[in-house]
């Protein structure tokens, strides 16, 4: 009887220990996950985000880890397909047992993955999409860092319209949650100055031919086009426009703010405006800290960094700072408790300060404008709050 009683107690103790154990956190390691486009239409963004994350993870581990624990990151490829993002989330959450999902790229993709995460109490931390659904409605497992696509365009479109005396504004947008957010932001911004779109036209995710959409906007006499496009589609639609002699003012969201636009699109991309926060890290940047960081990245990966590498780097950096403050007993709850009082100052890349609270899970609503001038992005406005 005594032996049986002892065995029963031991089993209960083991079960209690398992129940209390935090997924993704061991005595020696913290495992986080991310889902990127490493093979689809946003591959130029996803690969850079992954490398930026890897750079910061390696730095953290070289410096002793987080409270003595090494940081491990597992990255899955969605190919920019929400169905693959869902499967990737299932693997990361249920098989790899990640502590947190960080910097997952894509609006529809995050929406597909979040239910899988939330079922296992896994935070969706700083996704690489600026859709409002990333922090609305308020949820204990949602944290976003960037001004929304909606607010970016709501603030910047009226500014350009007024400055350039534009009378006719049109929009070309991806027919999904991302594109609709950009389109609606422009709609709200125009409404604030007594205007509306002259023409709206859309395309399906992954499209490569924009001739019919461009012809439609050209026929409508559009003087400015709000682009709900990412990388390949920005290049394709502007390239088609230039080819047909249609040269309006183009304004995109920060989804199109990266160096792939001018590197792949060439001279035709000059003049494009984009809303943005952190600036693209050129190897010959005027800022010495940015030059140092960019050249460190180049040395490690033999590739020029883009702003998506910066995003990946900063996301892991903020995660590490919060996890460090949460202490040795790192759990979802202890992380969230720190996060709900977190403030970050502006960084070397010009990102705005951020602040979080129990009722505010989006870091900043500030945006500024950049323009491609002579084949490089150049910041052309202060922050618009």
Question: PLM features: what roles do these ranges have?
Answer:
Residues 29-31, 44-51, 63-135, 203-210, ...:
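Beta-alpha junction/loop-to-helix N-cap segments that form part of ligand/metal-binding clefts
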Residues 25, 29-54, 76-83, 105-108, ...:
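Extracytoplasmic "Venus flytrap"
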Residues 300-309, 320-377:
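Segments of small-molecule ligand-sensing domains
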Residues 85, 145-168, 208-211, 234, ...:
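Hydrophobic alpha-helical segments within soluble ligand-binding/sensing domains
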Residues 97-200, 249-274:
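Extracytoplasmic ligand/sensor domains, especially the bilobed periplasmic-binding protein
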Residues 238-312, 379-384:
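Extracellular/periplasmic periplasmic-binding protein-like sensory domains
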Residues 1-31, 384-385:
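Short, low-complexity disordered leader/linker segments with a strong preference
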Residues 21-34, 62-70, 161-167:
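Immediate post-signal peptide segment of exported/extracytoplasmic ligand-binding proteins
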């Amino acid at each position: 009887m005594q032996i049986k009683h002892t065995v029963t107690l031991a089993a209960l103790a083991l079960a209690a220990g398992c129940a209390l154990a935090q997924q993704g956190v061991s005595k020696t390691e913290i495992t986080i996950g991310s889902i990127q486009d490493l093979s689809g239409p946003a591959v130029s963004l996803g690969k850079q985000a992954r490398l930026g994350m890897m750079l910061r993870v390696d730095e953290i581990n070289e410096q002793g880890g987080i409270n003595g624990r090494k940081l491990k990151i597992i990255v899955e490829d969605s190919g920019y397909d929400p169905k693959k993002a869902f499967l990737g989330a299932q693997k990361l959450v249920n098989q790899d047992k990640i502590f947190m999902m960080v910097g997952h790229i894509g609006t529809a993709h995050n929406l597909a993955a979040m239910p899988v995460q939330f079922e296992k109490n896994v935070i969706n931390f700083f996704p690489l999409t600026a859709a409002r659904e990333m922090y609305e409605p308020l949820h204990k497992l949602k944290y976003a860092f960037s001004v929304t696509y909606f607010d970016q365009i709501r603030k910047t479109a009226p500014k350009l319209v007024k400055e350039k005396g534009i009378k006719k504004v049109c929009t070309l947008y991806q027919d999904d949650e991302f594109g609709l957010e950009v389109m609606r932001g422009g709609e709200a911004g125009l409404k604030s100055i007594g205007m509306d779109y002259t023409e709206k036209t859309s395309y399906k995710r992954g499209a490569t031919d924009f001739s019919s959409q461009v012809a439609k906007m050209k026929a409508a006499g559009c003087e400015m086009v709000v682009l709900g496009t990412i990388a390949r589609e920005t290049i394709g639609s502007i390239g088609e426009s230039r080819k047909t002699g249609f040269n309006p003012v183009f304004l995109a969201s920060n989804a199109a703010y990266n160096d792939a636009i001018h590197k792949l699109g060439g001279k035709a991309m000059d003049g494009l405006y984009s809303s943005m926060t952190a600036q693209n890290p050129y190897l010959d940047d005027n800022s010495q800290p940015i030059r140092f960081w960019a050249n460190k990245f180049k040395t490690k990966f033999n590739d020029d960094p883009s702003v998506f590498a910066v995003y990946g780097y900063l996301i892991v950096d903020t995660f590490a700072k919060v996890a460090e403050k949460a202490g040795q007993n790192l759990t979802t709850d202890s992380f969230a408790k720190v996060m709900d009082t977190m403030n970050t100052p502006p960084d070397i890349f010009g990102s705005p300060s951020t602040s979080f609270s129990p009722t505010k899970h989006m870091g900043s609503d500030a945006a500024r404008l950049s323009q491609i001038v002579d084949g490089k992005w150049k910041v052309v406005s202060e922050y618009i709050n």
